[in-house]
Design a protein with these regions (language model features):
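Acidic, Ser/Thr-rich low-complexity intrinsically disordered segments
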Residues: 200-224
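Charged alpha-helical initiation segments
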Residues: 1-52
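Short amphipathic alpha-helical surface patches that serve as generic macromolecular interface elements
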Residues: 140, 144, 170-173
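Short helix/strand-bridging catalytic loops that position acidic/His residues to coordinate divalent metals
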Residues: 38-43, 153-165
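Short non-catalytic regulatory patches outside canonical folded cores
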Residues: 59-141, 148-153
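Amphipathic, Lys/Arg-enriched alpha-helical patches that create a basic surface
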Residues: 162-205
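Short, hydrophobic, well-ordered secondary-structure elements
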Residues: 23, 30, 44-69, 170-177
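Substrate-binding/catalytic groove segments of enzymes
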Residues: 138, 147-161, 180-189
Length: 224
């Protein structure tokens, strides 16, 4: 097994398998709350736990993706969405805008209007900022409210832990799914191989074949 294949198998065991475990926990909550947009504001302790776990994993994977494309980037503990958001925007912009279908009926685009750019400040240091017309995902901002001040009331008078709801959780899961699938596709392409990893139970990526008007479904990026 060469180095590229090792990177692929490491990703599957360290990241993709963990996603599937989180997804299994989410799937088990359907016994109590139907997966339906009518329940978008439903919140619970289980959703709170999963929301924080999924968003934390997005942060971890985002840094991994940036380090993969720019090995000089080192994770030191102070990096945030501005840093890895720049890497994701630069190297995977088209991929992350792909719509995701949840339980075959709910279409999500969690990275819509997402984009960061790098600029040099007056001292010549690289800084990161949102590109014109782009914005930080609302579900990510809500995650930070939950993470840092979950018992504090927001401007609407509601306690922040209520932001750990069905809508935000599905958006976060879809966001992680998109990153995982397309990064896995990158690793497969670099290794010039296909890895038959286990498929998601709840999420499917839809893409448009440039040579066809038909939409196709994809559960593994490497299958494109």
């Amino acid at each position: 097994m060469d180095e590229k294949e090792k990177q692929l198998t490491h990703f599957v065991s360290s990241y993709w398998d963990y996603f599937l475990e989180l997804e299994n926990e989410f799937a088990s909550t359907q016994k109590y709350v139907a997966f339906d947009v009518c329940n978008k504001n439903t919140y619970s302790i289980e959703y709170l736990k999963l929301f924080q776990a999924v968003c934390s994993e997005i942060d971890v994977l985002g840094k991994e993706i940036l380090h993969h494309f720019e090995p000089e980037f080192k994770v030191g503990g102070f990096e945030n969405i501005k840093h890895w958001g720049y890497g994701v925007s630069k190297y995977m912009r088209r991929s992350i805008l792909t719509p995701v279908t949840f339980v075959e009926k709910i279409e999500l685009t969690p990275w819509k209007k997402f984009g960061y750019e790098s600029v040099l400040d007056k001292n010549g240091y690289k800084r990161y900022r949102l590109e014109d017309g782009c914005e930080k995902p609302k579900w990510w901002s809500d995650y930070n409210h939950v993470k840092h001040a979950r018992t504090t009331c927001g401007e609407d008078g509601k306690v922040n832990y209520q932001l750990a709801n069905f809508s935000n959780l599905t958006q976060a899961f879809a966001a992680l799914f998109v990153l995982e699938q397309h990064y896995m596709g990158v690793l497969m392409q670099e290794a010039d191989t296909y890895y038959a990893a286990r498929e998601s139970r709840l999420f499917v990526i839809e893409y448009v074949d440039p040579d066809s008007d038909d939409k196709k479904e994809m559960s593994l990026a490497g299958a494109v």
